[in-house]
Amino acid sequence: MIIDGGCHCGQIEYRAEADPEKVEICHCTDCQTLSGSAYRTVVPVDADSFELLCGTPKLYEKKAEDGSKRLQAFCPECGSPLYSAAPNGESGYFGVRVGTTNQRDRLVPKNQYWVRSAQPLSLIHISEPTRRA
């Protein structure tokens, strides 16, 4: 499916093709810190399909818990986290932050990882329906 979205202030907009079956929740401590929450929801998109429509994100490189390096992209104006990517395009995909997409209601998590770092009561029961409030 085609997804689009952007930052909170509107300075950065993007479009990409995503597989809604690959939406994931990450419980690593980096994602907890960077999201300001107990976890982050991400959809991987092929780097070739990702297109910046306007704006230029600020990038910085972070070494993850497992030793891998990831570029973190965020809006330089409002600070919205937009995506992560491997340095020099090594992995060929971007981890788009689902909360920045306009289709977030259709990007339902199917998997979760780094569960050993999960906060108490934050593991999502993916196979069970959730109550909408």
Mark where each language-model region is.
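Short cysteine-rich clusters marking metal-coordination/redox-active sites
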Residues: 6-9, 26-28, 75
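Cys/His-rich metal-chelating microdomains
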Residues: 12, 29-34, 81
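Short, non-ligating residues that shape and space the ligands of small metal-coordination modules
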Residues: 15-16, 37, 84-85
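Short cysteine/histidine-rich metal-coordination sites, predominantly Zn2+-binding motifs
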Residues: 22-27, 41-51, 90-101
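Helix-adjacent hinge/juxtasegments
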Residues: 43-77, 81-84
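Short Fe-S-cluster ligation motifs
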Residues: 57-68, 102-123
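Single conserved hydrophobic/aromatic residue that forms the stacking wall/gate
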Residues: 124-133
